[in-house]
Amino acid sequence: MISAVAGDNFLGGEDFTTVLEQMFLREHEIDEDTLDQKTRAHIHKQAEICKLGFADAKTSVMKCNINGEVVESEIDIDDYEKSCQVLLGRIRKPIERSLKDANIKLKDIEEVILVGGSTKLSIVRRFVSRLFGRLPNTSINPDEVVAVGAATQAAMKERNEAVKEIILTDVCPFTLGTEVVSRR
């Protein structure tokens, strides 16, 4: 049973990539407005590669070719985490809101399962560990669990025999509004 739903629909992996882009541009004193679209796309791709490099390392390198010159930064995970504090704070708010809505205390949570691609980031996992006071369950692929959930929901909508025993009870995650039209 789902007791509460909360989230930030405007927060995701791209936001964490953008932080790396901004760190790189700042370090090399590059004005983003002076870059052409191709160079911006190249920097973005290299920031994404750099972000993925943190999966198994404390530092990651971002190397970009800008106007024929190779510009390189070695970024430390702790510096990256400090630069992501605003984003991590945005993760905290929906967690706190859903716990409050469900009337659940942090100490009552038995297990934390991370869902979605951004939860593979070590800084997100560390943040969640500190918030909940325990390590999250990492035995489930956070991308696959989304796909399995979507497939299960689709099978339920199609009334597939394989999922006939599954019942999903949800809260309404959206605010409801009413419009009144007067013809006077």
Give a label for each model feature.
Residues 1-184:
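Oxyanion-binding/catalytic loops of NTP- or PPi-dependent enzymes
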